Amino acid sequence: MKTLYLPLFFKMKSWIICVLFISFSPILMSQIYEIGFSVGGTNYVGDIGSTRYIQPNQLAGNVFFKYNYNPRIAFKGTYSYLPIKGDDATADTPFRINRNTPAISFSNTIHELALGMEFNFYEYNTSSRTKNWTPYLLIELAAFNYDAIEKEEDLNRNGQIDADEYQYDRKTRIAIPIGVGFKSILSGPIAFALETKIRYTFEDDLDKVAGNNRDLKIEGNSNDWYVFTGVSLIYTFGRPSCYARRN
């Protein structure tokens, strides 16, 4: 009897393996990944300096990893190194230029980890001859770490930091990055992208000056923003996806 059941067992086993392979093959075949880095500039928008949202003045960069879920959607993780600075001497409003003497200035360094989704306006296919470029929208959630003054009393009446007296500490907070960009294949698995990403924070002390400091003539009380604008070099690897049609 055992001899009679053996052929049936092997047939069922082969059938089960075949069904599992067919079921999971789209997942296995869709493993298209991207790694890359960006180089560009940052700028800050807050209580000090220029109020322009895109005006890079500090060299910055990031590294990232992406998983292309389909031709329109990708999941992205990014680490960014983002120095920022502001100086009322280069402000674009008379109020900020003239409010204090000497002019208020600051510098800070932000370390950021972000996770989000990239939405392509057109189908983007690294194996296609025609669908190899697209503008895109990026929405993320980020955790960022920066220097913050612990006590407002550490600032003197002109808004400058008394280096021998002030106390500061690193803070980690949440930001909401939103970006737009354009990407295109260069050659084979190599692509490039141009991107601007602006972050809204829920903090008002990236400039190490709190908006409610009574000794300073602060204009407005909105939270701070920081922006990165740059160019990316991207390498695509992994198995060709199930949607990769060469057309």
Predicted feature locations:
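Short loop/turn motifs that connect adjacent beta-strands in outer-membrane beta-barrel proteins
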Residues: 28-32, 72, 123-134, 186-189, ...
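Residues that define the transmembrane beta-barrel architecture of outer-membrane proteins
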Residues: 31, 55-59, 109-113, 133, ...
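Predominantly the C-terminal beta-signal and adjacent terminal strand-loop region
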Residues: 187-247
